[in-house]
Amino acid sequence: MHRFYHSNSLDLNQIIILDEFAGHHALRVMRVKVNDPLILFNGDGFEYKAQVNSINKKTINVEILSKEQNDNESPIRINLFQSISSNEKMDMVIQKATELGVSTIQPIFSSRSTIKLSLDRTKKRLLHWRQVAISACEQSGRSKIPIIKSPILFDQIAEEIESLKDSLSLVLHPDNHQQSSNLPKDYSGDINIFIGPEGGFSKDEVLLLKQENCINMQLGPRILRTETAPLAIIAILQYKYGDFA
C-alpha cells in the first residue's frame, strides 16, 4: 500500500487534501484512483489508513479511516554528526541513515570540508535534506521523521556534546585502533556518531573530540568513504544494541 507524508495533524473521519509534493507523486507517479487505499503519516508515530475520496486536476482528497500506532522505531537513539559532503553523497547518507533508524542528523562544517554554503544555499539544502528524509520514511515504513538540524561549524560541537554528555560518543577515524568489538556489551542510552569529511577530521578536531570523552574508533582494516562509514557503524550499532539482532 502506498505511503505518503502529510505535514499537518490528522484525525479520524477527516477529509484532507494531500500536500502538493505527495499529491503530485500520487497522481503522476503512483497513478492513484478514487477509492484506492493509502497510508498517511505526519511524524507523530502513528499510521493513518485512508482512502482516496476524490481527484481533481491537481489535488487529491483523502478520507482518514483508522489510526494505528507504528512500533517499528529503533529502541536506541542514534545521533549522527555528519561532515557535509557533495550533494549526492550527503543525500545518500541522509536517505540510508533514515532507513537504518537514526533519530537526529547534525550536519557539520569541519576544517577539511570542501563544501561551502552561503546562508541562502544552506536554507535550501536543509529543506532538501528534510525532504530526502521524508521520502526515506515513506519507503522504509517509519512514521517518525529524524530531526535534521541546521548545519553548524565544528567549533560549535562542544556545546552539542555538553548537552549529550551522558551518551556514548564515537569518532570514526582510520588511524585509531579501537575496534567495534570493544564497545560496551550492554548499553541502552543515546549514541552519538562523528563522521569526518573526505580526508578525515584534522588532528586538532580529533583532539577536541577526545577531550570531550569521545571514543576514537576504526571499522576494520580498510578506509571507508565519508558516505560509507556512517552506514556501516549504524548497522553495527543496530545489531549490537538495537533491532537488527
Question: Model-flagged regions — what are they?
Answer:
Residues 38, 62, 145-149, 216:
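Generic structural signal for residues in well-ordered beta-strands
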Residues 167-205, 215-217:
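Active-site/ligand-binding-proximal alpha/beta "capping" segment
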Residues 71-168:
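RNA substrate-binding interface of SAM-dependent RNA methyltransferases
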Residues 38, 63, 69-81, 185, ...:
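Mobile, glycine- and charge-enriched loop segments
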Residues 203-245:
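Structured adenosyl-cofactor binding patch, chiefly the S-adenosyl-L-methionine
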